[in-house]
Curated annotation (Swiss-Prot):
It comes from the Eukaryota. The gene is Ptprv. This is Receptor-type tyrosine-protein phosphatase V. GO terms for cellular component: membrane. Residues 1101-1705 are cytoplasmic. It comes from Mus musculus (Mouse).
């Protein structure tokens, strides 16, 4: 192996030496520096955008290797990115996978020996790619196309768009766009033209292109017209369409629905359609086409002419004319036939008719018939004519009738003729010659039965004789019997004979009768039937009938027929008991008979039971052994020969069988169930009757198939007797009576309220009678009866005491009545174990020592849970442990860390007690303060501001919890003594102590999320302490020098408190308050406020609470409860910061405050509430009113405890008994509740609960549900009104006291969305409700306290009662003291504000109130008319929240203006100076009471509106009419009320009695009507000048006091007033003067609406707020109530919606 390695090394060395020789020879060559001849390199993409192809030609021979390097170039021309390298010995190379359109740098290196390489650098660019998804489409306009595409891959510089015609290559558009442009719109193109779009992608000088072809849309053709050229052709015309290549014509046959299509070339504008159907409507559609586009133009409709009918033929018939023809080709709408000649007639026929008849008789003459064919607007006309001869017009006579007349005078005169006439018609009918000597004349072929006249004419034409006579009539045809409906009737009928007659005669005869035929009956010629009545049934008759005319009769026609037999009469069917048979009986019918046929049917189901033939003498028949309870029908008919009469029918029943096995059971206390078994046979129904003590109670009737029935609404626990009866028609059979009991009544629900070891059980009994029975309440423990107590029926409350906490028992109620007993479902009472008591936490640095007392009862263990509180409000679990002991050591804790400890007791029933939670903080390791800290700095000129510096007591001063300021006038002390901290300002000022504790405040340097201050300056001597002996920062003694020291306390409540002092400061002289500058005093006050806020925040944050161990005098005096007592005011501007601080750490500060309040007032006596006589009057046993504040009712005689009700007086903001808090009434205390309302003069009731929640009755329904009044004791309550909103309901009651005979109105406001033991969803809804309550209370100022209740009267009631004064305090003082408010509440009623969530919610409401800030002025500004409806809807949302907010702003604005006598800016100084001045002047003229003193106010209308003068008070005629004249009033409106004492005739002129004053004379002219409103026209004449003026007087409509007019009435009246004021030619309307003897709400409303309508009509805006404010500032107008303010908006909205404000001049 080694020789081989040595050989390889030698070979390598030899090759290296050879290369060195070559390189040495090259170094000496002349081409060394030049590098050899250059290369010729070419670069191309060869049509592929992602590759570059390099080729080169070497200038010198030799096979060299080549190295290639490729790098991309950026926009600046510099290489970047990864380079591609390649080696080759070829003369070309291709790079693949490049980015299209990108620039690249190429390096080609010739690798020569001895490192004599030659490198060529050049740049190149790949070819770009074409764009993707190129589209060219029409935009809907004939002159534009829109192109769109997706960008080309790779890089590009721009896109070039070339649009040209493909045939001529004429360029239409050439534009370049940036690569970011992906669409382009080409305009101004030729319609209907083909274009090619080329999109060229440029990348440097390289490009790639793609193209697309598209057409523009042609212009749609227009002015399409179609005209008919004949019966089978239509010609169309249209205007040429620009750009259209072809026109598509579609002709639609509107009758057949077929289409005819034709395509014509461009340039053609007309086309004729041939071979169409005559008389047919066609619709033509035209479409212009160019390329793929088709644009439809208008449509046109036209008819072809109808074709002519052929072969019109007129044919005369007897007495009429007949026409026929052949229809032409095609369609038609119909025919019109017009007959002209002696008779004119026009007839219209349908398109399918081909003949017509013109009825006669037609007179002879020449007739022409015109036949017109209709088709759309066109017609075709043909005519035909005919001559109608007289013979054709005369009616044809019946042949065979002969007229033979005698009495012809014989004469020898020749040439006589007999002329025949019809008596009824004037025409000549016959003319024959009469031979001389003839005595009769005969005519043949006449009408039978007709009346003729024959005139004998001489040869000279004279009538010598006239004869009349009749032809013989023909007999009636087809005589037959047509009806035998009744046994005593026959109806005959016949057909009239040809010819005429005057009547018919009919007679008849009974076969076998010896009497002559019956009466002859004459009938008229038009009668063809006769009914023969009162014939004998079952008899045969011969009937004869003939016709007669004049004295001639026809032959008689006879017919023989028989009447039917009569049915039997008085048929009856009844049941006979002895023997038990069903018996039928009847009476014989009149007429003939041979026998009776008797059939018996059973009706259900219909079955023939029996069929018998009885003799003609039979009158009854019986059936035995028929089934029971069935209904039978008997049919009896009479037989006579082969005839059978109609049957007589009747029904009857067999008696039913009684029900068997009757059984009665009680299914419910008020229900009995009766059942039975069906007996054999049938029945129609069952009747079950219920008796109680022999008195019928109820009856039930059921069907025959039923086998049971039930009775409801019975009396519980009662014995009843039941009678069951089977009915079959009128027959019945009863079963034996059965007795039964109803179950006794038991409560349908047991509701228990647990409290410690007792329970209050509400027993809910069903409504209705309680009935009878005995009940017991039973407690069971583990299945064994442990306690039993009798209950009275209906008892609704049960008190269970001395229950074992932590134990479970079951409660049931059992009741017995007779043999029955009932029981409720057991109610499991799981008694919650009591919480641990006397919890004490002793903190140390690394552990907490916890002690407690276990509650009594069945308890097992105590669960202790420990959580570490961290900043931000969260908590981390540490550990938990179960223990049966009463003490626990919690080790391994972190110093100066807060821990939340929760102790819960587990009862023997596995139920947990209420958790007792406390926060305990481990102490610091040890605080080692300096023996004496440096003296503090004192700021001069600020009332002695003492500055505490952070760190002045060492670096561990974070363990300091409290700082104190010690003041002294002793100039010799170096540091304070221990006794100084127990001396107060009172000891110093009045007892002569030289040193005292002036101020105590929490550590202000406690670490917080925000920055910690470096120092804290505290003003000293700023409070007015009076005689308080508590710690107080009182004024310093004037003229004394004071020194100050700082005291630091590590804790306040332990003997281990570490106390440190600073040295005293330099002495400073005190400053008298009188001598102190105002700015200094203000600064001091502000500083005090800041300190108070800071202390409050720190108190809330740290929540100090003392332990249970004994305390020395120092710690007792320094407890926060004692220090701050109950007053903890927070300025409104600091409330948000305080709220956020208290909310930190899971609301820890709120929790500690609430824990402090829990014990307040609990030790106060409640003896009256705990008295046994009053226990059942309390809804909950733990909510009992304190004796000192309870509301006492008037005691009823003989009832010593009737003065008790569960209610307390609560102080309000301005009165010690402003509010009454009470529980929701129980059923038995409703009367006491209304007594409370009446005796305490309550006018507003606030209800904060619903009647029932989650199945629990929270409050009894104590008011009427409808208009029917309800009486409780002496008080009757009427419901007057009820209005429901989303979150509350308003009601108004009228109370009537029967004994006192007095009435009073009370309003109830019920908040309906507040769950029990919870809070509303948002503070805004409750705040809006509070504002509503405040408005109602203001309206009833001084009329008694407000009554507030929920269910218990403490939780929701306490929250609401606390919110009322807190809101008032916030509005009046800009300060909130929630703690003190709740403290006072709990001193007057226990448990006020029941839960922590309610306490926090109270703060949330106040925070919302503060954050609302002042109302936006824009909300109450002018509103455009067009937006007014929207503004009304916005204000009405959320139960009128916007109106409430705006109204509060109005009241505040009115309050701000109170006392100011300055006139408004637009007041007219030349008119009535002011309302006060007017009162002063008029009071001199007429002395009247203050409330009736005259007052006048002017409301100017501006340059185009009318002025309005308002006069109030008892005005006489002189004052009224002279003011009318002075102010140029043209309209006078009187608002006098019916109860005013003024006499109308005193101020109004009468028709015959004008009013005359020193200035004017007033005449009554006439009564008129304006806009539907009655008015009086008055003429006023000025005495000196004689000038006249007409005044329109209108009377304001009357409505009840305190109510408003309906909007429609008021708006109609205002419209009438506006029209009166607008009369005349003046540009400015006449002045309106309104007079009212009293200041009323109606006056305010009228004045406001009158001005608002003027605004709307002239300015097109309205400003309700400003109008109401200006009017209220005037003396003549009252402040509107909230309801009136809303009424103004609604009334104005109605007016604008009805466009009432007409244009006014």
């Amino acid at each position: 192996m080694r020789p081989l390695i040595l050989l390889a090394a030698l070979l390598w060395l030899q090759d290296s030496l050879a290369q060195e020789d070559v390189c040495s020879s090259l170094d000496g060559s002349p081409d060394r520096q030049g590098g050899g001849p250059p290369l010729s390199v070419s670069v191309t993409s060869r049509g592929r955008p992602t590759s570059l192809f390099l080729s080169w030609v070497a200038a010198e021979p030799g096979g060299f290797d080549y190295a290639l390097c490729l790098r991309a170039m950026n926009l600046s021309g510099f290489p970047e990115g990864q380079q591609l390298q390649a080696h080759t010995n070829e003369s070309s190379f291709e790079f693949h996978g490049l980015v299209p359109g990108s620039r690249y740098q190429l390096e080609l290196t010739v690798l020569r020996p001895c490192w004599q390489n030659v490198t060529i650098t050049l740049t190149a660019r790949t070819a770009p790619t074409v764009v993707r998804g190129l589209q060219l489409h029409s935009t809907g306009s004939p002159a534009s196309l829109e192109a769109s595409w997706s960008d080309a891959s790779g890089d590009q510089d721009s896109y070039q768009l070339l649009l040209y015609h493909p045939e001529s290559h004429t360029l239409a558009c050439n534009v370049s766009v940036s690569p970011d442009t992906l669409s382009y719109n080409f305009g101004d193109l030729l319609p209907g033209s083909q274009y090619v779009l080329e999109v060229i992608t440029w990348a440097g000088s390289l490009h790639a292109k793609t193209s697309i072809l598209q057409w523009t849309e042609p212009v749609p053709p227009d002015h399409l017209r179609v005209r008919a050229l004949g019966t089978s052709s239509l010609q169309a015309f249209w205007n040429s369409s620009e750009g259209a290549t072809w026109f598509h014509l579609i002709l639609t046959d509107l009758l057949e629905g077929t289409n005819l299509t034709k395509v014509v070339r461009q340039g053609i504008s007309t086309h004729t359609f041939l071979r169409l159907s005559p008389g047919t409507p066609y619709q033509l559609k035209i479409c212009a086409a160019a390329g793929p586009h088709q644009i439809w133009g208008p449509n046109a409709t036209e008819w072809t002419y109808p074709s002519y009918p052929s072969d019109l033929v007129l044919t005369p018939l007897w007495n009429e004319l007949w026409a026929s023809w052949k229809a032409g080709q095609g369609a038609r709408d119909g025919y019109v036939l017009k007959l002209s000649g002696p008779v004119e007639n026009t007839t219209t026929l349908g398109p399918e008719e081909c003949n017509a008849v013109f009825p006669g008789p037609l007179p002879p003459g020449h007739y022409t018939l015109g036949l017109r064919v209709l088709a759309g607007p066109y017609d075709a006309w043909v005519e035909g004519s005919i001559w109608l001869a007289e013979s054709a017009a005369r009616p044809m006579e019946v042949p065979g009738a002969r007229l033979w007349l005698e009495g012809l005078e014989a004469t020898k005169q020749p040439g006589r003729r007999a002329l025949l006439y019809s008596v009824d018609a004037p025409g000549l009918l016959g003319n024959i010659s009469v031979s001389s000597g003839a005595t009769h004349v005969t005519f043949c072929g006449l009408v039978p039965g007709a009346h003729y006249r024959v005139d004998i004419a001489s040869s000279m034409g004279d009538i010598t004789q006239s004869l009349t006579g009749y032809t013989s009539p023909l007999p009636p045809q087809s005589l037959e019997i047509i009806s035998r409906n009744s046994p005593s009737d026959l109806t005959i009928g016949w057909a009239p004979a040809p010819g005429q007659m005057e009547g018919y005669k009919v007679t008849w005869h009974q076969d076998g009768s010896q009497r002559s035929p019956g009466d002859l009956v004459d009938l008229g010629p038009d009668i063809s039937s006769l009914t023969l009545k009162s014939l004998v049934p079952g008899s045969c008759y011969t009937v004869s009938a003939w016709a007669w005319s004049g004295n001639l009769s026809s032959d008689s026609q006879k017919i023989h027929s028989c009447t039917r037999p009569a049915p039997p009469t008085n048929l009856s069917l009844g049941f006979a008991h002895q023997p038990a048979t069903l018996r039928a009986s009847w009476c014989h019918p009149p007429g003939g008979r041979d026998a009776f046929q008797l059939r018996l049917y059973r009706l259900r189901p219909l079955t023939l039971e029996s069929e018998k033939i009885l003799s003609q003498e039979a009158q009854n028949f019986s059936w035995a052994q028929l089934p029971a309870g069935y209904e039978f029908q008997v049919q009896l008919s009479t037989l006579w020969g082969s005839e059978e009469s109609g049957s007589a029918n009747t029904t009857g029943w067999t008696p039913p069988s009684a029900p068997t096995l009757v059984n009665v059971t009680s299914e419910a206390p008020t229900q009995l169930h009766v059942s039975w078994v069906h007996a054999a046979g049938d029945r129609s129904s069952y009747q079950v009757t219920l008796y109680q003590e022999s008195t019928r109670t109820a009856t039930s009737i059921v069907g025959p198939k039923a086998d049971s029935t039930s009775f409801w609404g019975l009396t519980p626990g009662t014995k009843y007797k039941v009678e069951a009866i089977s009915w079959a028609g009128p027959l019945y059979t009863a079963a034996a009576n059965v007795s039964a009991w109803t179950y006794p009544l038991t409560p349908n629900e047991l509701l228990a309220s647990m409290q410690a070891g007792s329970a209050v059980v509400n027993l809910a009994w069903p409504s209705g009678p309680l009935g009878r029975g005995t009940c017991h309440a039973q407690l069971s423990d583990a299945g064994h009866l442990s306690w039993e107590q009798p209950l009275s029926l209906g008892q609704d409350l049960l008190m269970l005491r001395n229950l074992i906490p932590g134990h479970t028992v079951s409660l049931s109620v059992k009741c017995r009545a007779g043999p029955l007993q009932a029981s409720t479902h057991p109610l499991v009472l799981s008694v919650e174990p009591g919480p641990v008591e006397d919890v004490f936490c002793q903190p140390e640095a690394t552990y907490l020592s916890l002690n407690w007392t276990m509650p009594t009862g069945d308890v097992a263990v105590c669960l202790v849970e420990v959580e570490q509180l961290v900043p931000g409000g969260s908590a981390h679990f540490v550990f938990q442990v179960n223990t049966s002991e009463d003490a626990l050591l919690l080790p391994n804790l972190t110093p100066t860390t807060s821990y939340r400890l929760s102790l819960t007791v587990l009862g023997g029933n596995r139920q947990w007690s209420r958790a007792v939670t406390l926060v305990c903080t481990t102490s610091a390791e040890v605080w080692h303060p300096p023996e004496l800290a440096e003296a503090p700095q004192v700021e001069l000129g600020t009332g002695m501001g003492v500055t505490v510096t952070r760190g002045m007591f060492g670096k561990d001063d974070g363990q300091i919890q409290w700082y104190g300021i010690i003041a002294t006038i002793n100039m010799t002390l170096a540091q304070p003594s221990q006794e100084a901290i127990n001396h107060t300002w009172y000891d110093h000022y009045y007892r002569g102590h030289d040193s005292y504790l002036a101020l105590l405040f929490p550590n202000p340097f406690y670490p917080e999320p925000w920055a910690v201050p470096r120092s804290w300056t505290v003003p000293v001597g700023t409070e007015d302490c009076d005689n308080t002996q508590e710690i107080c920062n009182g004024h310093l003694k004037p003229g004394f020098q004071y020194r100050f020291s700082i005291a630091a306390f590590s804790r306040l409540s332990s003997p281990e408190t570490i106390l440190a002092f600073s040295a005293f400061s330099e002495p400073q002289a005190s400053i008298s308050l009188v001598a102190m500058p105002l700015t200094v005093m203000m600064g001091t006050v502000v500083g005090c406020i800041i300190i108070v806020c800071a202390v409050l925040c720190l108190l809330c944050r740290r929540g100090l609470k003392g332990p249970r161990s004994e305390k020395n005098g120092f710690s007792q005096e320094l407890m926060p409860y004692n220090l701050w007592r109950t007053h903890r005011p927070i300025p409104s501007h600091s409330f948000r910061q305080s709220y956020e601080a208290k909310s930190a750490r899971a609301h820890q500060a709120f929790f500690q405050e609430f824990e402090e309040l829990k014990e307040v007032g609990k030790d106060q006596p409640r003896l009256e509430a705990e008295h046994p006589a009053n226990i059942t009057k309390n809804r909950y046993p733990h909510v009992l009113p304190y004796d000192h504040s309870r509301v006492r009712l008037t005691q009823l005689s003989g009832e010593p405890h009737s003065d008790y009700i569960n209610a307390n007086f609560i102080p309000g903001y301005s009165h010690p008994q402003e509010i009454i808090a009470t529980q929701g009434p129980l059923k038995k205390t409703v009367e006491d509740f209304w007594r409370l309302v009446w005796e305490q003069q309550v006018h507003v009731i606030i209800m904060l609960t619903v009647g029932m929640e989650n199945g629990r009755v929270l409050c009894e329904h104590y008011w009427p549900v409808n208009s029917t009044p309800v009486t409780h004791g002496h008080i009757t309550t009427h419901l007057l009104a009820e209005e429901s909103e989303d979150e509350w309901t308003r009601r108004e009651f009228q109370l009537q006291h029967g004994a006192e005979q007095k009435q009073r109105r009370v309003k109830q406001l019920q908040f309906t969305t507040w769950p029990d033991h919870s809070v509303p969803e948002a503070p805004s809804s409750l705040l809006a409700f509070v504002e509503l309550v405040q408005e109602e209370v203001k309206a009833t100022q001084g009329k008694g306290p407000i009554l507030v209740h929920c269910s218990a009267g403490v939780g929701r009631t306490g929250t609401f009662v606390a919110l009322l004064p807190a809101v008032r305090q916030l509005e009046e003082e800009q300060v909130v003291d929630v703690f003190n408010t709740v403290y006072i509440l709990r001193l007057h009623r226990p448990l006020m504000i029941q839960t922590l969530s309610q306490y926090i919610f109270l703060h949330s409401c106040l925070l919302n109130k503060i954050l609302e800030g002042p109302s936006d002025a824009s909300d109450s500004g002018p509103i455009p008319v067009m937006n007014f409806a929207q503004a009304c809807a916005k204000r009405a949302a959320n139960a009128n929240a916007g109106f409430l907010k705006e109204y509060r702003l109005l009241k505040q604005a009115i309050k701000d203006e109170t006392g100011s006598l300055l006139p408004s800016p637009d007041y007219n100084q030349n008119s009535i100076a002011s309302c006060h001045h007017s009162q002063e002047q008029l009071a001199l003229v007429e002395e009247s009471p203050a409330d009736n003193m005259l007052a006048a106010s002017l409301f100017p209308g501006g340059p185009s509106g009318r002025d309005h003068v308002v006069l109030t008070g008892s005005a006489g005629p002189k004052e009224l009419w002279e003011m009318v004249w002075e102010h140029g009033a043209y309209v006078l409106v009187s608002l006098g009320l019916p109860d005013t004492k003024e006499k109308p005739q005193d101020i109004w002129p009468m028709e015959m009695q004008p009013i005359v004053t020193d200035m004017v004379t007033v005449h009554r002219v006439a009564e008129s009507n304006t806009a539907g409103w009655p008015s009086t026209l008055i003429r006023v004449i000025h005495g000196d000048s004689g000038t006249e003026r007409q005044v329109q007087c209108l009377q304001f409509p009357h409505c009840e006091t305190g109510s408003e007019l309906p909007a429609n009435t008021l708006l109609t009246f205002l419209d009438a007033v506006g029209q009166c004021c607008s009369r005349g030619n003046s540009k400015k309307p006449g002045t309106l003067l309104s007079h009212s003897s009293k200041v009323t709400n109606q006056l305010s409303t009228f004045l406001a609406m009158e001005q608002l309508l003027q605004q709307a009509g002239t300015e097109r805006t309205v400003d309700v707020f400003s109008v109401a404010l200006k009017q209220t500032q005037a003396c003549a107008v009252k402040t509107p109530t909230l309801e009136q303010y809303i009424y103004l908006y609604n009334c104005l909205n109605s007016a604008l919606r009805n466009r009432l404000p007409r244009a006014r001049k």
